[in-house]
Amino acid sequence: MEKTSYEKLPLPADAETAGVKAATLVAFTEGPAVDAAGNVYFSDIINNRIIKLSPDGTRSVFREPSFRTNGQTFDQQGRLYHCEGSEFGPGGGRRITRTNLESGAYEVLTERYDGVRYNSPNDICIDGRGRAYFTDPCYGDRSIMEMEIEGVYRIDTDGTVRRILAQPAIDRPNGIAVTQDSRRLYLVDSSPLKEGNRKIWVFDLDDDGNPSNQRLVHDFAPGRGADGMRLDMAGNLYLAAGVNVPRHAGETRDVPAGIYIVSPQGNLLGRIPVSEDLITNLAFGGRDGRTIYITAGKTLYTTRVAVPGQVAYPKWA
């Protein structure tokens, strides 16, 4: 099989030729989510806080401590969901929480499964019916694990939590996205181990949100695989993947850091290069849904694309 030359992938035809621009700097960025007013909420995991960046560039602390929040997303009602993890220091929540931005109400949706704590909830998405799907790997201290499984879970609208994917079907789940017709689930399966998975899977979903018919969309091996992921309105995947300077034996220079655009059929459509390590996640925003915000290292970057993002909230004009 011919080796893929990731570094030679062109900018997607709809991306700004100027590339990405820095929007703001913190310590270690993750989990961007954008509300209807254009405010960007993103995690600063090392400093244990969530930052709010207003459209005028004003930066403020939204929550501190954040209980090591990682991925975030909005539901159809404009409520902000948080994956409270366990990485980069003590005080991690190891749970899924939700904030009502209008009232300020903050609630715990789930913090245990079968009586034991989650590993480190990593990323989350909402389907068209309001159900939440989240991943629970362990990339940090594995001695804290109370369960042997690194799985994917669904929170139904009545609050019931079900584990829907686990080993051996998957290795280490990370980024996750569900189409707004609630029919397909995309999953990043990304292990830091040299022989671990660096795959993107797709599953069919039935009416109850149960996955089946697992297929491979793309495999980034032997390079660093993807982290966060989003979908656009055309159904294409936007994957925060790769590394510019490998950190350990499980990473190579085969996949340079950037946002990789992949069709639902697995075709590589382009790459938006990002020069800073470590690229982690992205979110769609802006009045028309065509601005993307990218978290990488200490920086929140922004650029423009032609196709709006596919999100539960807000709905683009």
Show the residue positions of the predicted features.
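Sequence-structural signature of mature extracellular/luminal beta-sheet repeat domains
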Residues: 1-317
